[in-house]
Amino acid sequence: MKRFKLNYFIIGLIAILLTWSLWTTVPWRNAHQDNLAAIKARGELRISTLDAPLSYYSVNNQPSGFDYDLAQRFADYLGVTLKVRVRSNLNQLFDDLENDNADILAASLIYNAERLNRFTVGPSYYSVSQQLVYRLGQPRPKNLGDLRGRLAVASGSAQITQLRQLKKKQYPQLAWEVSSDLSSRSLLEKVADGKLDYTLADSASVGLLQRVHPQLAVAFDITEEKPVTWYLRRSDSEGLSAALLDFFSQLNDNGIMARLEEKYLGHVGGFDYVDTKTFLNAIDATLPALQPLFERYAHDIDWKLLAAISYQESHWDPLATSATGVRGLMMLTRPTADSLGIGDRTNAEQSVRGGALYLSRMMQRLPDTIPEDEKIWFALAAYNMGYAHMLDARALTAKQQGNADSWVDVKLRLPMLSQPRYYKQTLYGYARGQQAYNYVENIRRYEISLVGYLQEKEKKAAQLAD
């Protein structure tokens, strides 16, 4: 998955095209403020989005998601409130835009040239490839000519354009179904459940959904990476497009976009089927007995994150013991346990209480210059390799002209702490930095799996209730 090095070019290109369209098609008068003026007069930015891992979802009854986060920041930038409409498929999304029920479609949509006769696009904020997905355990096709079963894609998706081109150029026998009522995510879930043989989906969505449905497997990419963008109405969007360009440029310049990418996309890679499947099994078998403890002692962090930390430490085994003598659900050392007033490290409640308290203290020691939503990652690195070595990583980051308050920058320096050419420059010397890096990344993946698992469980319960 490509990040913003490529997308600066895309943003610049869009800016040039937008400027040209303004000069050639719009008389210079106040009318070009169009939809932007209406949004400000209304005091409300209306977006339509999808219930999907990257776009919009709820955590502890609070909305989240890459697109939601960007949209909320854009609404703040405009000085208006944000109104979100969650849709279930692409047809509903574009109907909202065409019927003036939405100002922007913020749903991690892939750039599709076929839609540009009626809609326009905002800047790209990441890029993805299109992948053929099948269920693990079934024969893996080597190309589109190997398909033996039903292939379905969502109506209105960019995948249809690609399939038409491939059918014309290379695979004349290629056939597929178009679903008008199911989203790409729903089709992926049907593949995972064995109710559909194949579908096409973007690489980011597949990577995230594999955390909940590890039986999803990628056969191959059918496209190069393509930009992901927002859609606007073409007829009245010049002022809004210009505002979006300025807003996205600011996010790139001040580092916020890089932080958001790290938050929502930084843990997508590194999928391990066996590890993910084992974790999901443990959620069913072991977590219910421990969940009340994680909820009780989580305090300043989400209990699901505390549970993920504990799983990384001990695989939720209260009697776990390492070769170095750390023990319990949170794998506390004897000196650390003593400092926290923990008498029995193998007592589940004492261990969770002690681990949560130790992590809280670690977060409190961190400088206020670190963004609040990133402190947890610094604290976890310190929890694993020691606070002093985390300070070394920050100092090394600053020395290399990086941002010592940005987890995106600091995490890249963690592996350097085990390399002589770098740790000789530090105050506290050698550290197992790669281990700390892997530690934090694993926890983030476990948290994503747990959040997704619980969301699906809630959805299924709601469907049964209906």
UniProtKB/Swiss-Prot annotation:
SUPFAM superfamilies according to UniProt: Lysozyme-like (SSF53955), Periplasmic binding protein-like II (SSF53850)
Signal peptide as annotated in the record: 1-24
Q: Which reaction does it catalyse?
A: Exolytic cleavage of the (1->4)-beta-glycosidic linkage between N-acetylmuramic acid (MurNAc) and N-acetylglucosamine (GlcNAc) residues in peptidoglycan, from either the reducing or the non-reducing ends of the peptidoglycan chains, with concomitant formation of a 1,6-anhydrobond in the MurNAc residue
| UniProt keyword Cell membrane present | no
Q: Which PROSITE patterns match?
A: TRANSGLYCOSYLASE
One Pfam family name is SBP_bac_3
- Which keywords does the record carry? Cell outer membrane, Cell wall biogenesis/degradation, Lyase, Membrane, Repeat, Signal
Q: What class of enzyme is it?
A: lyase
The record ties this protein, via Gene3D superfamilies, to: 1.10.530.10, Periplasmic binding protein-like II
What are the GO MF terms of this UniProt record? Answer: peptidoglycan lytic transglycosylase activity
Instruction: Please give the superkingdom of this protein's source.
Output: Bacteria
* Family label: In the N-terminal section; belongs to the bacterial solute-binding protein 3 family.
- Annotated function: Murein-degrading enzyme that degrades murein glycan strands and insoluble, high-molecular weight murein sacculi, with the concomitant formation of a 1,6-anhydromuramoyl product. Lytic transglycosylases (LTs) play an integral role in the metabolism of the peptidoglycan (PG) sacculus. Their lytic action creates space within the PG sacculus to allow for its expansion as well as for the insertion of various structures such as secretion systems and flagella.
The Swiss-Prot or TrEMBL note on domains reads: The N-terminal domain does not have lytic activity and probably modulates enzymatic activity. The C-terminal domain is the catalytic active domain.
Q: What is this protein called?
A: Membrane-bound lytic murein transglycosylase F
User: Which organism does this record belong to?
Assistant: Sodalis glossinidius (strain morsitans)
